[in-house]
Amino acid sequence: MKKDIHPDYHTIKVEMTDGTQFETRSTWGKEGEVLKLEIDPKSHAAWTGGKQKLMDKGRVSKFNKKFQNFRSEKKD
């Protein structure tokens, strides 16, 4: 096996949307950093049965905001 080709695998903390945290091992970030989730099983529509809230910074939201006043008028 080749040496020094694999990313560093270390312990990080993951913070859920309700503020609870747990430790796991990952290649994300650096040792001890906190990964804050925006969507998790406690808030995702697939697990809660509710409608999914689109993020304001999401691509669909940006598109809809940009073109909210645009209307296609049919010419005869």
Swiss-Prot record:
The keyword RNA-binding applies. Coiled coil: none annotated. One of its GO terms (cellular component) is ribonucleoprotein complex. Disulfide bonds: none annotated. Transmembrane segments: none annotated. Keywords: Ribonucleoprotein, Ribosomal protein, RNA-binding, rRNA-binding. The keyword Ion transport does not apply. One of its GO terms (biological process) is translation. Belongs to the bacterial ribosomal protein bL31 family. Type A subfamily. Part of the 50S ribosomal subunit. Binds the 23S rRNA. This is Large ribosomal subunit protein bL31. It comes from Pelagibacter ubique (strain HTCC1062). The lineage of its organism: Bacteria, Pseudomonadati, Pseudomonadota, Alphaproteobacteria, Candidatus Pelagibacterales. The gene is rpmE.
